[in-house]
Every structure is written in structure tokens, then in C-alpha cells.
Amino acid sequence: TYTDRYIQEKIESGSSFADAWENIFGSLEYTAVMDQEPGREITIDWEHGGSDVMMARDVYRLIFEGREPWILSANGTIFKYDTKGIVPGLLERWYSERKELQAKKKDAQTAEDKAFWDKRQLVKKINLNSLYGAILNPGCRFFDKRIGQSTTLTGRVIARHMDAHVN
């Protein structure tokens, strides 16, 4: 990808991995699609194994003006949003369970009970925060680099967007 090559060139010129990403809040492919850059070719690798090369503006139209239930993450991965995946379903359940544990902590009468429920909700918080990191581990049954990258970069884009509107 353009992004992989760009980051690799920065690292080879002496930048650290973190410095190579300085001021880049989404993949170069994502930015090209969202800006509908003319002349920028994007390769789409489909789930069935085939590939298509399209102009960034055409990818934008395909995703946002087409009839498919698709959304584009900040790393350029196209996801379907008409069905809930295993990982989002699991996160939704854990989040709901954490909210219940936080409510029990709030309702607790003694310091010991508050500490107990606080530790229980903290375990859920750690589970929630760790899942996408685990998905980036090649030893994980659900290993998929795209999902971990999508979460990280999309979170960055959202934070940047919110910062621009708040500040």
C-alpha cells in the first residue's frame, strides 16, 4: 500500500515508527478516498480473493453513493454494517456487563463492596481495551491486522475530528 511504503521510507531514513506516523491520522489510501483525489489509484483486495484497481473518487462513490451496506475505516478497510460480527457482539456484551458492574459499585454500601465491584468492572475495562490488541497478535484465533489497524486509526481520526470542533 502507499501507506506501508511511505512509513517504510521514513523508517529507512532514520525516523522511528512513531515519528513516521507524525501528522498522519489515517492511511494515505483513506485520505485519498475521502478527498476523492483525482488520479490516485487504489487497489481493493476483495474477501473472495480478487482485486480491483479504481480511482480514489470511484472508490468513494462505490462506498458512499452505492447501494451496498459498506463503510470505510481510517486504514482503508471496507466493512459491511448490515450484520453484527463476532468481535463487535462480544464488545457490546462486555460493555453492557461493565455498565452493570459500575451500577453495582455505585449502589454498594460499604467501602469493601465498592472496592470489590470496582475491581470487577476494571477487569471488564481491561478486557475491552485488550481485545483489539489481541487481534493484532498472530497467535490469536481471530488474528487480522486490518481490524486492529482499523480500530486504532479510526479512533485517531475521531479524536482529531472532535478536537477540531471542541478547540
Language model feature labels by segment:
Residues 1-167:
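Conserved acidic
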